[in-house]
Amino acid sequence: MRKTELLIPAGSLDVLKTAVIYGADAVYIGGEAFGLRAKAHNFSLEDMKEGIAFAHAHDVTVYVTANILAHNQDLPGVEAYFEELKEVGPDALIISDPGVFEIAKRVLPDTELHISTQANNTNYGTYLFWNRMGAKRVVSARELSLAEIKEIRAHIPDDMEIESFIHGAMCISYSGRCLLSNFFTGRDANQGACTHPCRWKYSIVEETRPGEYMPVYENERGTYIFNSKDVCMIEHVPELIDAGIDSFKIEGRMKTALYVATVARTYRKAIDDYMKDPKLYEANMEWYKEEIGKCTYREFTTGFYFGKPGSDAQIYNSNTYVKNYTYLGTVEEADGKGRCRIEQKNKFSVGETIEIMKPDGRNLEVVVKSICDEDGNEQESAPHPKQILWVDLGADVDKYDILRKKEDN
């Protein structure tokens, strides 16, 4: 059986550390340019160095995205950026553009090159082409079924790796090649600046009836594709492994630490349980599904993995997100006596019941005993985001634990 890698996204240094602590085998990040997530916090070169050193100290690898579709004016900057990455030492670069690929081969000859899903990797001929060019890994197009991936695996060299998105948001356009953002806002999705107009609300206007706006909605005869559900394959880990997928990729370089920790920890346990004993994996299925439901998400689908998705893979109302738990903060320091320091993310109060989420899989339900600011002044609640607080939980709490609170839905 091939070793399965769990690949987790990180949009900031803090989230990278969370991903590492909560079970990632590898983390993918973006720099301040050329990485298709202009709105993510992204990493300075100094943050990259620190993050890669932290990951390597925990035997975790780090991949840097450089997967824009480059224009002529981008190429000199790409080369200069890759020269800077020599000092950073990423384990691999994720690339979609052949011109950028050639620059990477020349400037970073000892760094693994992975081909992004943006390159429309839908057949084994494409995989073999990139293998001849020197790529170590190809990220499969989201439009592929498990049967197609299995066929690709049978046609490519054994040491070539397949990476696939198995959890998170799906772009409505073929392998992410969308022009809606460009058209409506002038922001290029293929340059990392997508404004996600696929999630907006639309009406139809017939040209001979100006001013008559008809809302787009679903009925028993119609199928609409603008607002996809999120992919979730937590119930299908055996099928993913059987298809020959080497790296299970989670989408979400703009997600919170709570999201990253929850998804990483859940898939880590699911993979490990299955590898240990398939019956253990089946026995713990309800726990996996319950945990995945504790982060903010859209409704779930299996995407294209079992064939073309139908109308049940789309969302037809405006309230697309499901939010069951709120992220309160990550423990930055603990005194060993039940008190911890956090940077507060959302409001909570003394006397409230919250949950301590631990990297080892435990969840501890506790009552907040007291809240103090940095100067030791007590306060009844924490209403100000980013305030540094000392919180007395009277329980086993450690650095990197995450505090979360159940929503009153």
Where are each of the predicted segments found?
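Short glycine-biased active-site loop of nucleotidyltransferases that positions the nucleotide triphosphate
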Residues: K105
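Glycine-rich, positively charged N-terminal anion/phosphate-binding segment
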Residues: R37-H56
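Alpha-helix capping/helix-boundary segments
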Residues: G99-V100
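Surface-exposed amphipathic alpha-helical tracts and adjacent flexible/coil segments at the periphery
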Residues: M1-A10, V15-I21, A26-I29, A33, ...
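Alpha-helix capping and helix-loop boundary segments enriched in small/acidic/polar residues
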Residues: K39, T117-N121, S140, Y224
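Short beta-strand elements of ligand-binding domains
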Residues: V64-T65, I95, I115-T117
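Gly/Gly-Pro- and Ser/Thr-rich, intrinsically disordered tail segments characteristic of DNA damage-repair
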Residues: L75-P76, D110-Y124
